[in-house]
């Protein structure tokens, strides 16, 4: 069946903020009083696509729940400070490609990121007008599959395709019962039995 719409993931699919996020996390760790661990871009890439609190929990598996919540707040504040000042790096051809695709399909955006982060991407990239609707974990507190389903329902989409770069994106598409296209320039590894671009 021919797709009637395209739903995009954000990080690793449309842009890369691993370098400024790593610097932000190191700033947040310093403010939190942790100087023994330095975060790299590779650390950030390894958890990109997970909800923010889960990203922190994966990188700091031994931290108490109480300290985890405080650390999440500290890292989020530092990340917001740096990302709002610097933005990220759009992948080559993304802006032009989205404009061209938007002339053929309704475009949507679903990410596991914080609400402010998605809003800032849309403002910073000047691509807000390209997307008809968008949703994030930070806005709903719900997993990516639920947010894909919400976009599908509220926009009356019959045959959307979710486009992402990780196995988590693929699994979310499966749960939401939508087709999936894997982009191989992001942070994930190839996914079997899907179209890879």
Spans of model-derived segments:
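Short beta->alpha linker loops
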Residues: 20, 51, 89-93, 113, ...
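Phosphate- and divalent-cation-binding pockets in alpha/beta enzyme and binding domains
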Residues: 24, 55, 93, 117-120, ...
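Conserved phosphate-coupling serine/threonine residues in phosphotransfer and NTP-handling enzymes
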Residues: 13, 111-113
